[in-house]
Every structure is written in C-alpha cells, then in structure tokens.
Amino acid sequence: ISPFSYKLTPTAELVSPDDSDLIFRAQRSAVMPIMVVTNIFDEGFSTETLSGILSSPELQDRLIGNILAELTGKNYYGVNMDIEYIAPEDRERYNAFLERLTERLHNEGFIVMTALAPKISADQPGLLYEAHDYAAQGRIVDYIILMTYEWGYT
C-alpha cells in the first residue's frame, strides 16, 4: 500500500501525508507499505523544484537523508519515486540521483521503484517521457510501475 504522497520542497524537505494510521493498518495486515515521493509542489508537478534539487549535490544528499529518515522512522519497506515532468536537460542528473539513492537505500535494506508513463516509442516526444531513461531506470531500481492511467481516464 502506498499513501500518496510525500511532496518535495525546493529545499529538499518532504511534506508528509497523514500516513501513520494507514501504515499501522497495513503492517497489522501483513502488507508492505511503500513510501511515495512526488515532485508535486503547489498546484502540480514542478519541473523547476526537481531541477533545483538535481543541480545541487547538497540538496540531493538532504533529500536522500530525509527519505531514509521517513523510511526508518515509519517502518516503510521502500520508496516509489513518482517523479514526473522532468526537464530533458536533467535526464542524466536524474539517473545519477537514482543510482545514489538506490545504493544508499539498498545498504539499509530498502527497495526502490520508479513510476513511469507508458510510451510507444523510444523517442516519443513530451515532457512526461523525454527525460525518463526507461532502460537506465530498469537497471538502477528494483521495480518499475507503469502508469497506464496516463493513457486515459475511465
């Protein structure tokens, strides 16, 4: 079960959802709670907030530390990075961040996953697709969640 969501701030802090009761109930029912981190800021996904974090090793370290603190403090089993609308110029920085995050969390026994919009070609245009390196993320993280709901709402 994945409470939605921890939101990034421009200073790499996390705004927590009210998840304590849900985590308690999940664990009591032998269900693994997974933390979800998004780059939602104010009214929607923020390309700028994420870009600022990816441009700063210090902010990345702070974010990784904050994620780890929440994982251990609330007994989550891992994290799902639901990061959307990444600027194309941040593609490699995001891959490098995922590598650092995954290495650190694996050392502590946590799993890492990412959420990706499905696409029909490797060079599909659009901010939702261009900066995500699907092959690299497949190598870096433990699991990938395909957000098929991006193709329509029913």
Which residues does each PLM region occupy?
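Chitinase-like catalytic core of GlcNAc-active glycosidases
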Residues: 7-154
